[in-house]
Structures are given as structure tokens and as C-alpha cells.
């Protein structure tokens, strides 16, 4: 092959591409345009976060009133201030994270898994400082009852959270599910602190705190499974 042949090949390759049928372009444009519908913008982030905080607080209180608020009636002022101040902070952080996870590009305070881990550690520290009764009377039977009640309260909390944030888009479905599950778990823990009169340290350290990681993992697994494309 000579240099002239190579030049001819390159010139033909660089030549103008054949035109596309205008009718085909019109059909493509029409098909795309027919599927584009206007959407309402999300409310401001602070409104969404405030709504999540309100949902968690109202459901926790409603659950405690339904089961009777024996726990908070038995607490001292110091115990009430320490436990519920911590829960309020954790619920607020979880609410902000939930909103950030459904708004692409939104800055996050921390990864959801870190919130879940830090929340468990902080609750364990506060419970360990406040409650010094280390008896384990009916540890399993009482514990399973509290765990079940906390998880049962977390279910409507997670549904309400999903409904409020349903118009958002989660780039990382598992992380968003973990954040929502953690928030729902915190609502369950708050309800238990209002309701449960058992202040034995092993009971609250194991069964009350267990609601938080269980709900977080369940939320992440559910979101990941739901977001996985069908094969």
C-alpha cells in the first residue's frame, strides 16, 4: 500500500457522515417529549428535616401513651434530661441525613453507618452512667417484649419517613435505607424510654439499644433489595 492509498482512506474516513432522516429525528424527539412531565420541587430541606423530627416524636409519644408512660414517670429529672436530650440530638442528625440522602449532591454531616454506630455508643454511655442496677431478672422475656415493641413502633415510623421523602432520589439506596432505618429505630428507642419502667442496666443496654442497629440494617437491606433491577 502506497502513501497515496493511505491518504485516500483517511480522506474518505474524514468525509461528511451521511445525513439522518429528518422524519426519524422528529419521531425520536416526539417520543422523548411525551414522557417528560413537570414535577414539583421538593420543599426546603429544613422543612423536610423538621417534618421527620415531628413524625418521630409524635409516634414515640403516641406509642408510649398507648402502652402507658411508666418509664418517664419513674425517671428522675437528671435521667429525663440526659436520655431525651441525647435522643433529640440523634433524631435531628438522623433526620438531616435522611434528607441529604434523597437529594443528589447534598452535603452529608456523616455517613449513615457512622451515625448508627455513634448512636449506639452514645446511648450505651448514657445508660451506663445513669443506671447501676445490674440484676437480670427475667432478662430474656422482658427483653424480647421491649425489643418487639420498639421494632413495632419503628415500622410506622419508617413508612411515614418514606412517604415524606418519596419524591426525592437516592443515589445510594442502601445508605438512604440505613439512614431511614436508623431514624425509625431512634423513634422506637424513644418510645421504650418513655414506656419501659425496667431500669436494669443489662436490660436497657442490650434490648433497648438493639432496636437501633436492627432497624438500620433492615432499612439498608430493604432499600438495596427494592432498588435492585429485576433479572
Where are these regions (language model features)?
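Terminal transmembrane helical module of multi-pass membrane proteins
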Residues: 163-231
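Non-cytosolic membrane-interface motifs at loop->transmembrane helix junctions
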Residues: 75-82, 137-149, 174-176, 201-210
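Positively biased amphipathic helices and basic secretion/translocation or surface-docking motifs
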Residues: 11-48, 222
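Selected alpha-helical membrane-embedding segments in polytopic membrane proteins
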Residues: 39-136
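Alpha-helical transmembrane segments of multipass membrane proteins
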Residues: 59, 91, 95, 122-124, ...
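C-terminal ends of transmembrane helices
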Residues: 94-106, 161-169, 223-224
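C-terminal halves and exits of single transmembrane alpha-helices
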Residues: 116-142, 160-167, 191-196
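Cytoplasmic-side transmembrane-helix entry/capping segments in multi-pass membrane proteins
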Residues: 106-120, 143-144, 172-182
Amino acid at each position: 500500500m502506497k502513501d497515496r492509498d493511505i491518504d485516500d482512506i483517511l480522506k474518505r474516513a474524514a468525509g461528511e457522515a451521511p445525513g439522518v432522516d429528518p422524519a426519524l429525528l422528529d419521531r425520536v424527539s416526539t417520543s422523548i417529549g411525551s414522557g417528560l412531565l413537570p414535577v414539583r420541587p421538593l420543599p426546603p430541606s429544613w422543612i423536610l428535616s423538621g417534618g421527620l423530627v415531628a413524625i418521630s416524636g409524635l409516634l414515640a409519644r403516641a406509642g408510649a401513651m398507648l402502652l402507658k408512660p411508666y418509664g418517664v414517670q419513674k425517671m428522675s429529672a437528671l435521667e429525663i434530661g440526659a436520655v431525651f436530650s441525647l435522643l433529640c440530638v440523634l433524631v435531628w442528625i438522623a433526620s438531616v441525613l435522611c434528607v441529604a440522602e434523597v437529594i443528589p449532591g447534598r452535603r452529608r454531616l456523616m455517613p449513615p453507618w457512622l451515625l448508627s454506630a455513634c448512636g449506639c455508643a452514645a446511648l450505651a454511655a448514657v445508660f451506663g452512667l445513669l443506671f447501676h442496677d445490674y440484676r437480670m431478672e427475667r432478662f430474656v422475656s422482658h427483653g424480647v417484649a421491649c425489643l418487639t415493641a420498639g421494632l413495632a413502633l419503628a415500622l410506622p415510623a419508617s413508612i411515614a419517613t418514606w412517604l415524606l421523602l418519596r419524591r426525592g432520589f437516592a443515589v445510594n439506596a442502601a445508605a438512604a435505607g440505613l439512614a431511614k432505618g436508623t431514624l425509625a429505630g431512634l423513634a422506637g428507642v424513644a418510645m421504650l424510654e418513655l414506656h419501659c419502667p425496667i431500669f436494669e442496666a443489662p436490660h436497657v443496654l442490650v434490648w433497648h439499644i438493639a432496636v437501633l442497629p436492627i432497624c438500620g440494617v433492615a432499612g439498608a437491606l430493604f432499600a438495596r433489595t427494592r432498588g435492585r433491577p429485576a433479572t
